[in-house]
Amino acid sequence: MSIVSELSVNTPVVLVLTTLPDSEAASALAQQVIDTRLAACVTEFGMVKSRYRWNGKVEAAEELQLLFKTSLARSDELTRFIEANHPYETPEIVSWQADASAAYGQWITAETQRPLNV
């Protein structure tokens, strides 16, 4: 099998993006998600500036952006968890399915498996 055909076997994963008001809130949410195995990895992009209309006014805020990498099987649960534990009244939660390399996708799937109760 050639290297090209080995690399073309992709695994579907789900990426979930959200923003938080500060590093304390971002770190807490990221740690909870990893601890509960709802995502295999959380990437913190750092501060971004968001402009949006809220209650009839244009607002601007500096926020921390997080990108969660999870499996198809855990994506809905992750979205519900973020929504329930987010400090904003209407949090930005955007998700999309993506193809990952086979090894990375398998790692995400393995790391987001529910632990077996023994």
Model-predicted segments: where are they?
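Positively charged, small/polar-rich N-terminal and surface patches that mediate targeting and assembly
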Residues: 1-118
